[in-house]
């Protein structure tokens, strides 16, 4: 199949591209490289350096696509608080643009939303029927993308699959970006012998999901055309506190030091998914233990040139 990945030069996109090429799909990527890296794009994938806000280049890239995986977004909660308009433009208007491209080509459209849409809803574990209470412009923009995707399924019979990503980590994730995720940032600090920082007391929990697991689910969704326009939470209920992550890192970096800082505005205290729907739709997915996945990620970073 011909697959277009928006944001395909990013972390999840790179891992997904590698796997799709391995099993014989044709992959095209559109990415403005604002956070993605050109050198991460496999040579057998075609890269179009453009924003999803560029309608002409987007529609050209999407032409004849069987599947469009929409990963492109302006990520990060703090970044959205700093510039909410830019976040809205890319994540809401940009998503509308990608939906139009999918509709024009009758593509299977796969959308990546975020668990941040639950926001101030403190009930745990999260399930897909809970009330959404976004705390930040980023979360609101992802909620908007979900609604748009569902509306295109209902209004235009577009084949839609929507996932809510939780805290994904693994190889190819950038540690050096201003808004880098916690695990790659911490591993990079550990390798450099620097102390790591935690906003809050470290007892906040996250349902970390290894990127290989996410890729398995998306590939399964593509191969079997699993349609579910209502969002599906993509995490397996393996929540762990940041202090527990630190404890595991100390197995490899015993001299690791931690500095605790004031909590950040907009950060959710606890995140844990109820994977019931995910397991029913994707029963054959293999989920690695967090400790093993974390060690694999450390080893990957250690082997970087």
Annotate each language-model stretch with its function.
Residues 13, 141, 179, 242, ...:
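Hydrophobic (often cysteine-bearing) scaffold residues that line and stabilize catalytic clefts
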Residues 35, 171, 236:
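Short, conserved catalytic or interaction motifs in soluble domains
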Residues 56-59, 78, 85, 96, ...:
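Residues in well-ordered alpha-helical elements
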Residues 98, 149, 186, 278-279:
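Structural element of the ATP-grasp superfamily
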């Amino acid at each position: 199949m011909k697959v277009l990945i928006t944001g395909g030069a990013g972390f999840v996109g790179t891992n997904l591209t590698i796997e799709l090429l391995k099993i014989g799909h044709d992959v095209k990527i559109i990415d403005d490289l604002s956070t993605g890296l050109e050198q991460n794009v496999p040579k057998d994938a075609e890269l179009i350096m453009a924003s999803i806000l560029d309608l002409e280049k987007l529609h050209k890239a999407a032409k004849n696509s069987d599947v469009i995986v929409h990963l492109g977004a302006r990520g990060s909660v703090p970044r959205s608080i700093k510039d909410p308009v830019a976040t809205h433009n890319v994540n809401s208007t940009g998503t509308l643009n990608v939906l139009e491209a999918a509709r024009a080509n009758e593509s299977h459209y796969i959308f990546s939303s975020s668990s941040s849409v639950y926001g101030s809803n403190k009930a745990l574990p999260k399930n897909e029927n809970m009330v959404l209470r976004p705390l930040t412009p980023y979360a609101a923009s992802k909620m908007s993308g979900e609604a748009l995707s569902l509306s295109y399924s209902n209004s235009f019979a577009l084949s839609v699959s929507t996932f809510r990503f939780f805290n994904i980590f693994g190889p190819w994730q950038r540690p050096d970006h201003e808004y880098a995720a916690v695990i790659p940032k911490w591993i990079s600090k550990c390798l450099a012998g620097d102390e790591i920082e935690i906003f809050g007391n470290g007892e906040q929990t996250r349902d970390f999901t290894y990127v290989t697991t996410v890729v398995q689910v998306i590939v399964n969704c593509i191969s079997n055309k699993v349609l579910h326009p209502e969002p599906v939470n993509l995490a397996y209920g393996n929540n762990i506190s940041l202090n527990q992550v630190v404890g595991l890192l100390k197995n490899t970096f015993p001299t690791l030091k931690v500095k605790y800082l004031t909590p950040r505005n907009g950060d959710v205290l606890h995140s844990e998914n109820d994977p019931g729907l995910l397991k029913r739709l994707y029963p054959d997915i293999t989920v690695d233990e967090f400790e093993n996945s974390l060690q694999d990620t450390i080893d990957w970073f250690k082997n970087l040139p």
